[in-house]
Structures are given as C-alpha cells and as structure tokens.
C-alpha cells in the first residue's frame, strides 16, 4: 500500500522513493498512521535532514507551538533538523495540487466569496455561507430558517460568545479543522455545546488530554495552540457537503435518496443562487462552490454572463444553460464540486474525464484516472495508457507502465504496444540512435523495482530480455 510505503521510506530516508510517492502516486503528505504520527515526524526522528527539507517544501505541516510541531522538534535527531523546523514557513499542499479541497474551503472561509450572511460578534464581522452552515450543523440550519431567516446581518452580543472562539468554530464547520489558542479552549467548548456540535466537543476533550500527557512527559515543550484535524478516512465533512449536491438535484433525478435535511428545492432549501439547465433538467446550485472549484465556471459566472437567461420568476436564481453534457454526467461533476468525491463506474470514466478536462477540474480527472485504473488488462492497458498521456494523468500513466512491466512478455507480441513504442520513439525531438524512450524507461524502472529476491532477479532479466528483443526487432536501440 502506498501509504505504508511512504512511512517506511521516511524511516529509511529514501528521498527518491518519497518524491515518487508524493509526485507520481499522489499520496497525501500529511497522512497519519495508527500512532497519530506523520511522515515528517519519522523523518525528524530518524535524522534524515534532506528528507525533512523536502517534506517541508512540499506541504508537510509543522507550525510552532502546536502538538505536531513540538513533537517533531522534540523528536528531531540533530540540531540542523531542529533549525530547519524552526525556520519553517508553511508551504501548503495546494502548491502541488491546485484544486486541493481543504485549501478551497479555507479560501472560501477567509475570503467570503459569494457569501450571503454576515455575523457580527462584538463588532467583529464574519462573512459566511448559509448553505455550508446549514449542511454542517442542525443548530445553524434551524436558526437560519427561524430566528435569522431573511437576515443578511446577524448581530451576536451575548457576553459569553468570544469572537476568537466563534472564528474557530466557523473554521471547523468549513474545513473540519480547528486551530485555537489554549486560553480560548473553554470558550470554544461552550460554543460547541450551544451549537450542538458533539463530535467537536469530544475531539476537543480528547486533544486536551493528549496534549496534557505529552507536555507532562516531555519537559521543555510548550504547546500554545490546540489543533483538531479529521482523520484521513473521516467522511463527515464530505458527507455533509454532499447534502448540498443532494439538494441541487432535480426531483426527477433524485431517486432513492430518502429524507433530506432540508425541504429541497422549495422553502428554505440550501439557498441556491444559480441554476444550471442541463438538457431538460434544472440543478439549483451555489456560485461559491462552482466558482471556487473551477476556473471555467468562474469565468462563466463572474467574468461574463453571456449564456445566462432571465429568471422565470422574480426571486428565482438566474439560469445558465450548459451544452454538450448530459444530466447523468453532470451529476458526477456536481458531487465532485461539493464533496470532492463521486461514485464513478469505470464505464462512465472516459465521458466524465472529457467533461472534467473541459471544465478545468483536475481533481475530478484524477478520480476518473483511479476508475480507469480498474480496467487494466492485457487487452486494454495500451489504450488506457494513451488516455493517461492525452489528459496528463501522471498517476494513471505510472500505473499503466507498472502493469505493462508485469505482463511485458505478452505485450511485446501485441501490435498496439509495438505501435505505442514506435510513436514514443518518434516523439522524442531530434532523437539520436541511442536516446532513451520514455515508455521503455518507465517499464524498465518498474521491472527493476520489483526485484526483492534472487529468484526475482532471473524473472526480471527475462522480462527485460523480451523488451530488448522487441526493440532490436523494430530497429530501435536505447
């Protein structure tokens, strides 16, 4: 498994393997194991300075005075590593993955793009989105539909509501993450109780206990900021956001979704501000999500409105007609935009991939790549590899060449594979007789990387001989 491989490579200090896993296999740099440890922690603990610097430069988190930051500092094996950690300036994972979902939600919170309500807490304003608050909290859903209904500004003057704690609460509702100074933890717990966020309350209590034990057992450490992060496989945030996609579905396409948390699409609903018409179906959506997730929709909705139509009735959201897409395919776009996930059957993956490319949704393209990877067989691997090349899906391309390496002795007899090798050779500009061919190099790499025992050496040599014989037979030397 790639995640286990990442932790093992960090303990060994294998920078090349870690780089491959992060950049080619798309493994999350801040993933945690069952001991709540990160790849950066193991790199620090085992004294691999070069790897520590690489991880920090690629989005590994190590904020000062947090539990993770202090733990890395305390466990660091050398002074140069400690200096690197103290000099750390956060580089977010969005530098590697431009559409990173957590980064999108954080920007939505900080910038308030297309917000429709402002909370003023003791004079400090907080711009927010009714749809997100309602989807994440039944308390906010009820208040926005009753006491705060129709209000664009909500003033909160209660003396026990701390603006810092309220801001942290919004951060949790938007991102599933919470950063709060230890001096404000009690204020945050009070708000969590008031808003009936029992999961947050449990997480705060558990984190306080863990930090207290850590500080007591590690003299000299100082934790000033408490950080709550959802576990890697935690579905709560995305499941809540997917409720907004449920509400956006036309009634004729809703199927067996069951009882929804809001009366969709009438009444309170999810407060949509844009309607996408796809064929004969209307999807009631939110500009904040579509503009924030896609440069295509940002240009369409913010920069100009050439394809919009006048609303059918006063108060209805404006309508934009989308062409060259069916409702069945748009549903996958919809769920990805809101929840960063969609259940994508392999037979639809290529159609969704083409639309994701048109709508500038690289993350959805990667999901399509994962689905296409399920189709890898001797008969299909070359075709899937061509798709990966065409749509620049590096992980899928790597998976294809890895599979090719396993079945290379059969592939060399297939005309589609031979033609792919010829095309790759021709694509190398001004190729000399001994220049390498990328496809061949990748297959060789995966053949060599599988060698773990003496018996595997002979098998690898047989595979490489089959590949070399093919190259000779078609007049290529590389």
Curated annotation (Swiss-Prot):
Keywords carried by this UniProt record: ANK repeat, Coiled coil, Cytoplasm, Elongation factor, Protein biosynthesis, Repeat
CDD domains: BACK_ABTB1_BPOZ, BTB1_POZ_ABTB1_BPOZ1, BTB2_POZ_ABTB1_BPOZ1
Pfam family, one: Ank_2
Localisation: Cytoplasm
Main subcellular location of this protein, as a coarse class: cytoplasm
PANTHER family, sorted: ANKYRIN REPEAT AND BTB/POZ DOMAIN-CONTAINING PROTEIN 1, ANKYRIN REPEAT AND BTB_POZ DOMAIN-CONTAINING PROTEIN 1
Protein name: Ankyrin repeat and BTB/POZ domain-containing protein 1
